[in-house]
């Protein structure tokens, strides 16, 4: 466990982004994760649209991701429905991949297929490199987990990460 620049590893933006993708792929039940990644990288889905989705989800007793799956039926969503559908379809593709790949391979697919890596390349070189190193480290943690746990599923890996992140938070609060 290492503290880099005073920020807990699991509190780093790029790690939180990829964790949010993994949680959304795993179940889609975490509305915060869905909200975090719907525009990472940018997809042009605005706050007004997200608010309409959230209201629809609330009124119909469903999760945000479930509302997104029905976006074209929601009044006032308009052209944004296509962008939302693109996001939903991408998550569905990742869900299918998650059945065949371990988390490290899935992370690689997310980074490449979403354009996340391309976005990183637009940053200042040292910032981009630091973020890439953190993502590599996270992939290594995922690979290690799967190497040490036969029959591990994405849910198991996410539970492990949550546990480690909680312990890291307690450690950093104790300092």
Regions found by a protein language model. Give the residues of each.
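Conserved helicase C-terminal RecA-like lobe
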Residues: 2, 12, 19-175
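Short, acidic/turn-prone active-site loops that include or flank metal/cofactor-
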Residues: 5-9
